[in-house]
Amino acid sequence: MKIITCFKLVPEEQDIVVTPEYTLNFDNADAKISQFDLNAIEAASQLATDDDEIAALTVGGSLLQNSKVRKDVLSRGPHSLYLVQDAQLEHALPLDTAKALAAAVEKIGFDLLIFGEGSGDLYAQQVGLLVGEILQLRVINAVSAIQRQGNTLVIERTLEDDVEVIELSVPAVLCVTSDINVPRIPSMKAILGAGKKPVNQWQASDIDWSQSAPLAELVGIRVPPQTERKHIIIDNDSPEAIAELAEHLKKALN
């Protein structure tokens, strides 16, 4: 089985600066693998047998130049890494990202695609589902467990009150939650070995992808201004306390 695990590079949260104008400054923010995609990479590594091949794939802009992140990905189990770096993908919205990923995986070849449920920055929860739709594949999201029985995958989805069990054949797309595993901490041997694994770097033209006319445009990201807390505590549920709470809520909404 050939498994492709798709991941996104996001800025390190602790390095993001909020400006006086309530915008975000990413100038000093280093790149890292999105936390939810670490679960996807680990899921692929746990699912694969010795006869299987795991490829990691990402698309994006300047963040993909980070060699430290490349080694980090490859130290976590994938046998090879594919990067599609292009200025058009610098701030791509989910649909364009999905179209680029779909074009790339078709060129690479695959049996199973594994995504994180959402990205660690915007958490739109769209890209994996869109890739499945573009490729006309079976897609399951909210995956909390994967087992392999021959050529069949047994998938668990944890819903609000139930656990849904689904049998699935490949090719397919899975979007996994953070509950599925605890991502490994790579050993020194794995980190050193990562430098010997192949890295394939493409541009948009290499996968016959170009940006479509935008249906929406990301014009900016702003942080809501902080407001002072009222520090009003009502510590009982008497009719008088409930009436007092209602008055405070009315004042806050007016």
Question: How does the language model describe each region?
Answer:
Residues 1-254:
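N-terminal glycine-rich FAD/FM-binding segment characteristic of electron-transfer flavoproteins
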